Structure formats: C-alpha cells, structure tokens
C-alpha cells in the first residue's frame, strides 16, 4: 500500500510510506475526481469547520498487477512493461490529484470553501476496502462522500463503492448527491429517517 499525507510528495512516487498522525477528530472525504467528489469536499469542509475538525481527502487507485499476489514462479517473469504500466497509472493519479488540489485551493481562496486544516492521503487497492481499512486504522468521526463515482451509470441512485461503505462502516456516512441544492448541512430544513427496523 502506498500511503501519503501529501498527494504530490516524491515519497509516493519513490514508494516510501510517510507517517500519518493518528488523530480521530477528522472528517474523511473519499474522492475520485468526479463532480460528486467536489460537492462532497464542499460539504465535508463545511462540516469540519462546524465541528472544529480537520478534513482528510482520500483517493484510492487500483493497479491491475500485484506482484505479491502472483504465483511464486511467475514473480520472476514480472516484466518491465508491467512496472512501467504501474508508473503510468501513478503519474495519471498524480496529475488528477494536482488538478483537484488546485480546485480546492481556488475555492478556499475565493471563500467558497472554509479555510480549514486538511491533508491528503493516497492508497493503492480496492476503493471500498481501503476506505473502510482507513476508518478502522484512524477512526475519523464521520465520512462524507459522493453518492456515485465518475464511472457510474446515470440511472444508478447510489454507486457500488458508496453503498458498500454505508453498509459496512461503523461510523456515520453522509452520501452527497452532485445536484444537491444547498451547500451546508445547516441549510437542511427537513430530515427524513428511512429504516427497515433492523437492529443496525
């Protein structure tokens, strides 16, 4: 797993694992560079300001090749082209992260986002699994994420990653639609509580 508290750090490219402070007074915001992610950032930053917490923007990228999962004999056949493919994926992830980071900074400067302390984490793996693993390791107070990812179909009410996180998370999860008409939780005038009376 590659994990970094700074998206654009050379430590990520070099494969090092920077230390991350364990402070559970955080709002976790999983991002995937879609419009849903930016809306989730807006809500997450405002919520973090309201509860005097920090925000953590987490992106999980997936590489199709894991040398450690290959049969022992096949590890020696691991081709340079595969390593180059992984590096290309990392470069693309960094470019996307840089673009999102610039958007967040612009919105902070313009006053659209509150000027709070935030950090960025990059992990390799399956998104829902790494989000839940991060929650287990660092115990943030709440998760704020988009209802759908950028690759979801228009008719999907909620994406598979978000649905899995909601189902399995032991901390509260706010799923934010991209077209929600307000910017803060404090602007909500009515709350609908939907339940099947399951004990969870």
Predicted regions and their residues:
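Short, conserved glycine- and acidic-residue-centered signature motifs
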Residues: 37, 93, 158-162
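General small-molecule cofactor/ligand-binding pocket signal
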Residues: 56-58, 119-123, 174
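Structural beta-alpha unit
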Residues: 7-18, 22, 62-65, 91, ...
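Gly/Ser-rich helix-loop-strand patches that form or flank binding pockets
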Residues: 1-16, 129-181
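Small/aliphatic-rich secondary-structure junction motif
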Residues: 19-83, 109, 188-200
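Residue-level marker for beta-strand->alpha-helix junctions and adjacent short loops that shape enzyme
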Residues: 6-7, 34, 62, 125, ...
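Glycine-rich, charge-decorated loop segments at or immediately adjacent to ligand/cofactor-binding or catalytic sites
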Residues: 183-187
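A short acidic, glycine-rich active-site loop
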Residues: 78-96
């Amino acid at each position: 797993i590659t994990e970094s508290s700074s998206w654009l750090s050379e430590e990520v490219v070099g494969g090092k694992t920077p230390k991350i402070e364990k402070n559970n007074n955080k709002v976790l915001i999983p991002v995937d560079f879609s419009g849903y992610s930016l809306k989730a950032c807006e809500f997450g930053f405002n919520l973090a300001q309201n509860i005097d917490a920090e925000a953590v923007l987490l992106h999980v990228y997936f590489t199709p090749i894991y040398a450690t999962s290959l049969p022992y004999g096949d590890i020696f056949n691991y081709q340079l082209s595969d390593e180059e493919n992984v590096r290309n994926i990392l470069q693309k992830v960094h470019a996307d992260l840089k673009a999102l980071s610039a958007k967040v900074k612009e919105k902070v400067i313009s006053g659209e986002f509150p000027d709070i302390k935030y950090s960025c984490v990059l992990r390799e793996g399956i998104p829902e699994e790494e989000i839940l693993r991060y929650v287990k390791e660092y115990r943030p107070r709440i998760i704020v994420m988009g209802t759908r990812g950028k690759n979801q179909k228009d008719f999907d009410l909620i994406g598979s990653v978000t649905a899995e996180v909601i189902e399995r998370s032991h901390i509260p999860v706010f799923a934010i639609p991209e077209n929600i008409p307000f910017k803060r939780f404090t602007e909500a005038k009515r709350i609908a509580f939907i339940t099947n009376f399951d004990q969870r």
